[in-house]
Curated annotation (Swiss-Prot):
Residues 471-495, 506-519, 566-585 have a biased composition (Basic and acidic residues). Residues 316-349 have a biased composition (Polar residues). Residues 350-361 have a biased composition (Low complexity). It comes from Solanum lycopersicum (Tomato). This is Transcription factor MYC2. It is found in: Nucleus.
Length: 689
C-alpha cells in the first residue's frame, strides 16, 4: 500500500516566520469551548516532531515514529543527527493496524489514535505523543445534516474553516486563499480528532498517560462518566458528542478509541489491540487484509515522500520497505470519494517528487501542503517502476485546500495530489458541479479521515530505476481491487461489468476478482473446520485430514449408539405391551368379604379365627390364631396350595387350646392384596366339617 507520512522535522522551528507563529498562537489560544486548558494541549504547536532528544522544554510537540530505512537511500537531512535512534516498527503497517482495528470490530468506533511512548530526557518520565491516527467518521453523518443558522454555530464553523485555511497556508507557504472545498461543515468529532494532533501526555497524566502508567486498559462509557472525569481531554470529548473513550496500553504506547455511541467493555477488543500492536513480534512486516465491509481506499492524512524516497533514474539501487525523510510534502485526504463514470472506475492523482540537488537536501523541510482532496487513494502497489497512485473515485463530501499546481516529475512519471481528476474538461466541470451534492454512501465510508505520522515508502515490491519492467509480488491486500461504491446520487453511477453466473445471496458481498473469491472461500472453509473441531470430542491431531478422520469415526460411533438405543426402545415397548395385556386379563373373583372373626356352629361349637396378612412385593407374611381342633394346620396348607402360594417358611405352636401358625409365602401366577388374601384364607380355614 502506498502511504505517505508526516515529516519527522519540527514544523515550528526557528525558521518559521513571525506571522506564521502569531497565526498559530491565535489558533491555539482560541476562546472557544472546544480547546483544552491542560498543559499538554495548550502549547502552540500543530507540527509533528519525532526528534525527541532535541525537543524543547517549553514547546511540547506531537511525537511520531519514523520508518525503517536503507543506508543507500538515506537523505542528507536524515543523516545530520547521528544520535537519532532507529525505529522499532514499520510505520506503513501502523495505519493498517488502526484501520483493521476499527473496520474489523463489531462495535462502531469513530476514530483510533496510537499515542507513541518516547523518552525526551533520561531523567524525565516518558511522553506520549501523536504516533498515528485513523478517522472513520459517524454512521449517521449524512442523516444529521442540520440546517443550523444560529450565529454562534456559524461563527464556530467559520473559525474552524479559517484555521484550516491558514494552517494550510502556513505549511504550504502559499498565501491563504478562498478554497470553496473548505466551506464543508467540520463536525465536532472531526475537529476533536484534528486538534488531538497537538496534544501530548506525560506518563501518568491524562487518560492515555494513566493507562500507560498503570499498564491496564481504561474504559470510560456514558455521558455522565465522561463529564465527571478529572481528565480535561475526556470532558472535552464529551462536549464534542463522544460517549465512549477507551485507552488500551501496548508495549510501545497507548491505543485510544472513541465513539459517539455507548459501547460496553469488550475483552475481544483488548485482545485484538494487544495482538495488532505487539511490534516486538515483527508483526508490522506483513500486510493486513482488507475487511469485506470496509472500503480499503479509506482516506488518509498522508505525506508524499520526498527527496530521500524518490526513485531516481540515475540510481539503479533497490529501495527497501521504507525510508525516513525529513523533507516531504504533507497532504490530508479527507471526505468521501466521487464515482467516476469512466470504464475502469479509477482515477489517478498526480504526485510530484521534488528533485533537489544533494547540496539542497539538508534544508529544514520542504514546503508542506494540506490537501483535503475529493478523492481517496486505494494504496495499490506500483508496477513497472513508476510511482503513480491508483485511486478509486467515489461519491461524497469534498474538502480540498492547498496548492494544486505542482509540476509532474519526468523520471518517476508521477504527479502530486492536485485535487483534480484526470478525466477531461467535460468530466472536470461535471465534478465541480457535483461537489456540493454529496449523498450518504455508507456508514463505513462517510467522512473518513486518517492520519499517518512517519515516513513510509510504498510497498516493498516496488522497483527503482529507469528500466524497472518487472511486476512485483504483492500481498492479498495489495492485489485485491477496491469494491465499487454503491451511490444513490442523481447522476447514474458507473455500471461495472460483472461475470455471468448466479447472483450472490442476499446480504453477501460479491467478490471482485478471483483472488478475493479464493480468500473468501478459504476463510469460509477454515471457519467450518473450526466448528467441526469444536464438536468432535477426541481429536488425535490438529491437521485437517486427521480431523476429518476423527469426525468420521465419531459419527459412526454415534450411529451404532443410535441403533442400540433403538433396539432397547423396541424391547421396552414389547415388555410394556405384555404387561398391559396381562393386567387386562380377568382374574378369579375374590371371595365375599367376611369378618376377621367368623363363627359357625358345628355340633353346637363355635370356631374363632384371627388372620393377619402383610404383603411385601410378591412375598406375603401370614399369621393365624385359631382353635386347635379340626386340624387348622392341615387346612392352612391346603388353602395355600389352592391359592398357588409357595411356602418358604412355616411354624406351628400350641398354647392350651390355641394354635398359632406363621408362614412366609411367595405368590405365583397372581398378585393378591392383603384384603383379598386374608378373606380367602379365612374362608378356607374357618370351614366346618
Amino acid at each position: 500500500m502506498t502511504e505517505y507520512s508526516l515529516p519527522t522535522m519540527n514544523l515550528w522551528n526557528n525558521s518559521t516566520s513571525d506571522d506564521n507563529v502569531s497565526m498559530m498562537e491565535a489558533f491555539m489560544s482560541s476562546d472557544l469551548s472546544f480547546w483544552a486548558t491542560n498543559n499538554s494541549t495548550s502549547a502552540a504547536v500543530v507540527g509533528v516532531n519525532s526528534n525527541l532528544p532535541h525537543a524543547s522544554s517549553n514547546t511540547p510537540s506531537v511525537f511520531a515514529p519514523s520508518s525503517s530505512t536503507s543506508a543507500s537511500t538515506l537523505s542528507a537531512a536524515a543523516t545530520v543527527d547521528a544520535s537519532k535512534s532507529m525505529p522499532f516498527f514499520n510505520q506503513e503497517t501502523l495505519q493498517q493496524r488502526l484501520q483493521a482495528l476499527i473496520d474489523g470490530a463489531r462495535e462502531t468506533w469513530t476514530y483510533a489514535i496510537f499515542w507513541q511512548s518516547s523518552v525526551v530526557d533520561f531523567s524525565s518520565p516518558s511522553v506520549l505523543g501523536w504516533g498515528d491516527g485513523y478517522y472513520k467518521g459517524e454512521e449517521d453523518k449524512a442523516k444529521r445534516k442540520l440546517s443550523v443558522s444560529s450565529p454562534a454555530y456559524i461563527a464556530e464553523q467559520e473559525h474552524r474553516k479559517k484555521v484550516l485555511r491558514e494552517l494550510n497556508s502556513l505549511i504550504s507557504g502559499a498565501p491563504p486563499g478562498t478554497d470553496d472545498a473548505v466551506d464543508e461543515e467540520v463536525t465536532d468529532t472531526e475537529w476533536f480528532f484534528l486538534i488531538s494532533m497537538t496534544q501530548s501526555f506525560v506518563n501518568g497524566s491524562g487518560l492515555p498517560g494513566q493507562a500507560l502508567y498503570s499498564s491496564s486498559p481504561i474504559w470510560v462509557a456514558g455521558t455522565e462518566k465522561l463529564a465527571a472525569s478529572h481528565c480535561e481531554r475526556v470532558r472535552q470529548a464529551q462536549g464534542f458528542g463522544l460517549q465512549t473513550i477507551v485507552c488500551i496500553p501496548s508495549a510501545n504506547g497507548v491505543v485510544e478509541l472513541g465513539s459517539t455511541e455507548l459501547i460496553v467493555q469488550s475483552s475481544d477488543l483488548m485482545n485484538k489491540v494487544r495482538v495488532l500492536f505487539n511490534f516486538s513480534n515483527d508483526l508490522g512486516s506483513g500486510s493486513w487484509a482488507v475487511q469485506p465491509e470496509s472500503d480499503p481506499s479509506a482516506l488518509w492524512l498522508t505525506d508524499p515522500s520526498s527527496s530521500g524516497m524518490e526513485v531516481r533514474e540515475s540510481l539503479n539501487t533497490v529501495q527497501t520497505n521504507s525510508v525516513p525523510s525529513s523533507n516531504s510534502n504533507k497532504q490530508i485526504a479527507y471526505g468521501n470519494e466521487n464515482n467516476h463514470p469512466s470504464g475502469n472506475g479509477q482515477s489517478c492523482y498526480n504526485q510530484q517528487q521534488q528533485k533537489n540537488p544533494p547540496q539542497q537536501q539538508t534544508q529544514g523541510f520542504f514546503t508542506r501542503e494540506l490537501n483535503f482532496s475529493e478523492f481517496g487513494f486505494d494504496g495499490s502497489s506500483n508496477r513497472n517502476g513508476n510511482s503513480s497512485v491508483s485511486c478509486k473515485p467515489e461519491s461524497g463530501e469534498i474538502l480540498n485546500f492547498g496548492d494544486s499546481t505542482k509540476k509532474s516529475a519526468s523520471s518517476a512519471n508521477v504527479n502530486l495530489f492536485t485535487g483534480q481528476s484526470q478525466f477531461g474538461a467535460g468530466e472536470e466541470n461535471n465534478n465541480k458541479n457535483k461537489k456540493r451534492s454529496a449523498t450518504s454512501r455508507g456508514s463505513n465510508e462517510e467522512g473518513m479521515l486518517s492520519f499517518v505520522s512517519g515516513t513510509v515508502l510504498p510497498s516493498s515490491g516496488m522497483k527503482s530505476g529507469g528500466g524497472g519492467g518487472e511486476d512485483s509480488e504483492h500481498s492479498d491486500l495489495e492485489a485485491s481491487v477496491v469494491k465499487e461504491a454503491d451511490s444513490s446520487r442523481v447522476v447514474e453511477p458507473e455500471k461495472r461489468p460483472r461475470k455471468r453466473g448466479r447472483k450472490p445471496a442476499n446480504g453477501r458481498e460479491e467478490p471482485l476478482n478471483h483472488v478475493e473469491a479464493e480468500r473468501q472461500r478459504r476463510e469460509k472453509l477454515n471457519q467450518r473446520f473450526y466448528a467441526l473441531r469444536a464438536v468432535v470430542p477426541n481429536v488425535s491431531k490438529m491437521d485437517k485430514a486427521s480431523l476429518l478422520g476423527d469426525a468420521i469415526s465419531y459419527i459412526n460411533e454415534l450411529k451404532s449408539k443410535l441403533q442400540n438405543t433403538e433396539s432397547d426402545k423396541e424391547d421396552l415397548k414389547s415388555q410394556i405391551e405384555d404387561l398391559k395385556k396381562e393386567s387386562r386379563r380377568p382374574g378369579p373373583p375374590p371371595p365375599p368379604n367376611q369378618d376377621l372373626k367368623m363363627s359357625s356352629h358345628t355340633g353346637g361349637k363355635i370356631v374363632d379365627v384371627d388372620i393377619d396378612v402383610k404383603i411385601i412385593g410378591w412375598d406375603a407374611m401370614i399369621r393365624i390364631q385359631c382353635n386347635k381342633k379340626n386340624h387348622p394346620a392341615a387346612r392352612l396348607m391346603a388353602a395355600l396350595m389352592e391359592l398357588d402360594l409357595d411356602v418358604h417358611h412355616a411354624s406351628v405352636s400350641v398354647v392350651n387350646d390355641l394354635m398359632i401358625q406363621q408362614a412366609t409365602v411367595k405368590m405365583g401366577s397372581r398378585h393378591y392384596t392383603e384384603e383379598q388374601l386374608r378373606v380367602a384364607l379365612t374362608s378356607k380355614i374357618a370351614e366346618t366339617h
